[in-house]
Amino acid sequence: EVPSNMLMQRIGARKTLLRIMVLWGIVATGMMFVTTPMQFYVMRFLLGVFEAGFFPGVIYFLTKWYPGSRRGAVLSMFMLGMPISGVLGGPIAGWALNSLDGVNGWEGWQWLFFIEGLPAILLGLMVYWILCDEPSQAKWLTERERALIIRNVKVDQANNPPEHGHSMLSALKDSRVYILSLSYFTFISGIYAIGFWLPAMLKNAGVIDVFQIGLYSMIPFGISAIGMVLILSLIHISEPTRRYAI
């Protein structure tokens, strides 16, 4: 992620997101042609390499458009996409494995990688043509809207100037770093554990039909989405008073 972030400072978030999403989608789609364990390991490694920098890139992009008072709600809406993808991905995966197996000579799992990898490529191209690195470049905004966004961001930056002189050692001494790290670790561990192992657990529990496994798999993600919506409502309440810091 560090090289990706350094490159993003030079070329901007728009080109960075284009690079990440297109390469990410190409590798994900290419997984459909894997036939050996070594090919699988290489493709998974490349997927991680190309995926790195996506979340920092999105956060950096949003800081150009939203002041701190609104950033919490915007980031929460962005993160809401993860459980929603789980809700949609389970049934889609079950349908692809059941209904597309043998179509065009491809097995169901190959269609699954094709269906889930191609949208990333298309969305990456859309990001490049639709998004702008700076509000001043947004032709789809009126002059008044651009001026308002730029003013709000500048006022926020003036009220919260960046702190200099910090080192890696000082960051390691900050308790908030460990609290946030633990929070993100538990969040990602839950997401990956459910995403990777829940289908196998359901099959071992006696659910045979692949599509039914996909439907059952969406339940925990749906509950997670509801919880994040409730948290989002709390953020809307706390942001006016800015009482949400750790």
Locations of regions flagged by a protein language model:
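Short hydrophobic/alpha-helical segments at membrane-entry points of transmembrane helices
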Residues: 36-44, 179-180
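Cytoplasmic helix-loop-helix junction between adjacent transmembrane helices
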Residues: 43-80
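Glycine-rich segments within core transmembrane alpha-helices of 12-TM secondary carriers
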Residues: 75-97, 119-120
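Central mid-sequence intracellular linker of multi-pass
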Residues: 104-167
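Extracytoplasmic gate region of multi-pass secondary transporters
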Residues: 171-228
